[in-house]
């Protein structure tokens, strides 16, 4: 197990997979992994969906008690992909830059004032200007007051 501390306090203990995929706090999400977890200011709008700018993202988190409240949606860059034929959980983005890092490409995109990072397969064709990114519901982490719901 790994223990993550902040300001002398244990904030999470768990396996590397647990810390990476389900960080208990936004601090752990930011601290573990490279690049850091994408964290988006959003609003809980239904039992399990959030709104980021004008995009609706469905999650597997019960948000009933937080409806119409501000939350943060966290997702790792490894889980964000360029959309194929998915119809839901899409972000319309402007491609900012693509870095070829050998075994993968790091896509940096903008959606309004948000910056989104995605690690994509090195063989994937990346659109030069606009793209749709898919956010899988099962990989979303939703935070309220910086803590995982």
Across the structure, where does each feature detected by a protein language model lie?
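Short, glycine/charged-rich "phosphate-handling" switch motifs in NTP-dependent
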Residues: 1, 13-14, 22
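Beta-strand-rich soluble domains of envelope-associated proteins
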Residues: 1, 19, 98-101
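Catalytic metal- and UDP-sugar-binding loop of GT-A-like glycosyltransferases, i.e.
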Residues: 4-5, 75
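Short acidic-hydrophobic catalytic motif
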Residues: 17-21, 29
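A small-molecule sensor/coupling module
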Residues: 32
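Non-catalytic connector elements of ABC transporters
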Residues: 35-39, 45-149
């Amino acid at each position: 197990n790994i223990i993550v501390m902040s300001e002398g306090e244990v904030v999470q203990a768990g396996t590397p997979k647990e810390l990476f995929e389900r960080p208990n706090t936004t601090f752990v999400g930011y601290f573990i992994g490279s690049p850091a977890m994408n964290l988006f200011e959003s609003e809980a709008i239904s039992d399990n969906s959030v709104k980021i700018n004008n995009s609706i993202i469905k999650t597997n988190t019960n948000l009933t008690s937080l409806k119409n409240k501000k939350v943060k949606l966290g997702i790792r860059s490894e889980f964000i992909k360029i959309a194929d034929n998915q119809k839901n959980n899409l972000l319309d983005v402007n491609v900012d830059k693509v870095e070829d890092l050998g075994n993968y490409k790091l896509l940096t995109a903008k959606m309004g004032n948000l910056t989104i990072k995605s690690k994509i397969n090195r063989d994937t064709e990346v659109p030069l200007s606009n793209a749709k990114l898919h956010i899988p519901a099962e990989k979303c982490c939703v935070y309220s007051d910086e803590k995982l719901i």
